[in-house]
């Protein structure tokens, strides 16, 4: 099997992946700020790094996968105050909702899922180290800030020059800062902060800045120098740039070897975002589409490419997934283990080892499906199911997928009992030689999105189309 090559944002190139410890991978991914339901952009991040950790394990690595939860920040505080509830009540509720969405999409839980509020002492410890090393200072307003210009390598991840950055572009100008580009490590508490929004520290009551949370959790749980850090493309700057400055400023060593960033989700060629009002929650999508269809829609686009969201693309994903499940219908896969020397498995592995090239890997699945359709071979069916399983796909019994309604509760879809009753009425019409009535029922079902297939021996199978 070829070596795994990963596009490293830091190097701006594909590199052969070499873990710090042979056979072990330590990976941190920036998770979700829990004050609302997860949207399609979150779904992409969740699925992408689920695929990454699945593939790393599939090729033999022992993986420690950490994905954090941000459960304290300004948006969370504002939402809790607006709702008249405690911060913990709000965040617990949306953490539960996030887990429900993850389960629907077939996301395997990370090995460790730390909440920011569980690591306040470690964050303060890192801030004190930065202060001792000359990178942090307490401003006149009580905030503790990071002095960006004192970190010589600032901008190495994003390629941005300090001299080219304008204050106010990503951070608001603040007279208390020594430099407008400095960012906050510890925010002094406000008089009207609700309960649970601040902690005691040597700098006074306050709460951590967003960036220090991930630095402290990553270094605490994975060590001060680890293998992979991932997240959405929008986090590359300033969040991940600031993580590097904090972590390396505190420890004096390289923070992360490989940086992975998934691309944006777009609607009509614009980035999907709350500010543009063009975003959809995972739950809204799952009201109309099966969760595995949504997962397939995400998986079939390369993780670094833009993902174009539309009903047309989701409908196409449903049709494509239906083709794969149809190939497995009426074929019982054999029970042998996956053999990486098999030609289809080799092509699949070569694609995944080429920076997780899922479009090519999925093309291999369709090649296999075509051969299964032609040969009805149990070994090929097993390979199709096993390889798709590495992507979190084709895990259901084919008829269960083919006979379900399109969404979680698609309005107007015939129930299974209604379909079976019509099939029974059609069979009765055929026995009575009323073929016109039998044809009418078949056409009626097809208009309702149900295709029939008469089998030898007189039985009839059906699937939704």
From Swiss-Prot:
It is found in: Cytoplasm. A motif ('HIGH' region) lies at residues 32-42. Its main location: cytoplasm. Coiled coil: none annotated. Gene3D superfamilies: Cysteine-tRNA ligase, C-terminal anti-codon recognition domain, HUPs. Binds 1 zinc ion per subunit. ATP binds at residue 274. Zn(2+) binds at residues 30, 214, 239, 243. Its EC number is 6.1.1.16. It catalyses: tRNA(Cys) + L-cysteine + ATP = L-cysteinyl-tRNA(Cys) + AMP + diphosphate. Keywords: Aminoacyl-tRNA synthetase, ATP-binding, Cytoplasm, Ligase, Metal-binding, Nucleotide-binding, Protein biosynthesis, Zinc. Monomer. This is Cysteine--tRNA ligase.
